Amino acid sequence: MKLVVGRKIWPPSRSRGMLPDHHTPATWALPGLYVVGGWVVVFVLLVLLSRPALGDGPEIAAADAQPAFEQVERWVRAGAVPVDRLKAPMTGVFGVQVILRDEGELIGRGSALHQDVADAIDQLGPEVDLNGLLAIATRSALEDAQDKLKRRAINLDLGRPELFELLLQEFYSRALVDVQIGYGLTSVLLPPAAADDAIFGQFAPGYHGLRMTGPLAPEADLLWPSAILARNTSPRSQLRQLLDRQGYNIEDLPLIARQGGPQLQRFQVYHIVRASQFQPARPLVRGNLALNQPLIDSRTLDGLVERIARHLEQKTLPAPQRDERLVRGPYHPSYNKVDPELAEPRQVALMCYAMMLHCERQFARDPNNEKNRQRAELVAQVIRRYADTALPGLEQNNHLTTAFMLMALNHGPVTVDIALRDDLAKAVLAMRHPEGGFRAVAGQDTRLSRATAAVLTAALAGQAIESNNPAYARAAWLGLAELFRVNQDDPKLVDLVWVSTALGRAGDRLAAASDDPDAVAKLAGYRAFLSEQTELLIDQQIKAAPLLGPDDVVGGFLLSPAPAGSPPNPTWQSAMPLAIVALSLQDPGIIEPDRVHGPILALGLGARFINQLLLTRTNGYYLRDLAMADGGVRNTLWDNTLYLDCSSMSLIALTQFQSALDELNRRDRASDE
């Protein structure tokens, strides 16, 4: 009983608070002397004396990581670890991992743990020679690399000793070093009544490493964050691996961190990587370069938009037919693989809309920009290649393809295929059901989903502006009325993205073309509703560092429920509320001029989060094909899969942010005249 009291007085790792003076171990149990007396005090003191003594070395800190990295890199360049070396006594460290890569490919890996790792759980632990651990891990990584390169040399008929030695020396000179120093080993404990999946709320994927022990295996197993990110290992797969190694299976997931089951600890790392020979070694947080500024400025925003647009541009490839282009499917950086080989037509159509929206905004700023014109022409070639998939008459579900392709053709600085645009517009108009909604199949009563109806309505609104045809305006207005009616009671994020798009592009024109005598009043009501929803979305944005996990989530939006206390896990879908806020900011009927500062702040934070999702050379230290990945928006901060939708929706949101800033600047200039 009194031992528990003593342990409570001793805070765990520094992630939970300041540690007391560890030079006098007995002081942390002194409060027990005031609670009990006699033999219980003697018992407590005996327990304390039986615990391993804490060292006198300094506690590991972020500043220690860079010298450690430089030490390892010198050893790697020399191809050997010296026997005689200085010691670096530290407390708080329990282990290290060293990885050697060549152009993103893992060539060698080594780890080293202190023999008393268990004594570092929930406390600083004993003194450790950091250089000693680094030496063991580096030597192991070099041996691993030598074995792998030896096998490769034999396959290439370069196995003769003198040739192999040259191969090794060349590798040592260019090897990219990745060093992780583990600290803050913290127990994960779940109450018996916790939900079966509660364990997923106890660690931030890709930021925390994991260690598991259990009664079925003699040794603990660890997963290090850098390797987790490089392999694109999901949280569930991480736990599955640990369970398998401990003699369990995935069905035993509810046993983790409970009495009698496998025990779990999470830990943090100081992570230093040299991502390329031409870059300095940098500290990374969750494999990412930590952004110091809370917001991004307009120049950084422009650069971010350009990188995403360039990434989408390189997703295209020549088609067999002249003046047409295909689009690659999702890229999986961890496997250096495109799978499936080609994107779905719906994904391609959304990309075309995003790119044309971007090109249109660039053209408005600089009509003579030749690079922008060429980019728009490239998108037009993609549209020509996929036009048949967007036209009616095919068996596949092509409603969204038709709508997004129409929206793409109604933007952009190049001459479009008017006949194709009109055919697509007629196809969308024909989907309208006379009793409301949109038909799934011509001549049948089956209605399309709300989300699809919202996209079709946005497409009709755009066509109403471009064609000046009242039939499209009336159909778009009816679609808006239906969508606002259902969203009043049950708002859906996807609906609001495209409703905002339709209203922002053509709201006043649609109301004017309507036969509804209450159209103006309804339009005001729609804007008031979007104003309210915009505020609610901003309230769901992460604006400060979480209690558990890093601050790379700041700017993202919490769009799904999670267990209390769990680290936030925003995804690329944060681009959707970002687009809604940006569209609302462009309309003074939704966000009044004296209320723009909050939304601008939210947009700046949101753009910062999208920037954190971006794959670059720095956070893509494991990339084997940078050109395929650079500028792509990841699925999440721990899932590097580059789906086309992630980058397309992010480009739409950020382009609307740029347009919102353009509109605010226009208002400022107008007020000065």
Predicted regions and their residues:
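CBM-like carbohydrate-recognition segments
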Residues: 343, 539-553, 562-578, 587-673
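Bacterial N-terminal signal peptides
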Residues: 36-48
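Well-ordered alpha-helical scaffold segments within catalytic/enzyme domains
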Residues: 287-298, 349-369, 403-417, 455-468, ...
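N-terminal secretory signal peptides that target proteins for export/translocation
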Residues: 1-32
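Basic nucleic-acid-binding interfaces
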Residues: 57-279
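Low-complexity, Ser/Thr/Pro/Gly-enriched N-terminal "stalk/linker" regions
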Residues: 280-347, 422-429, 433, 541-545, ...
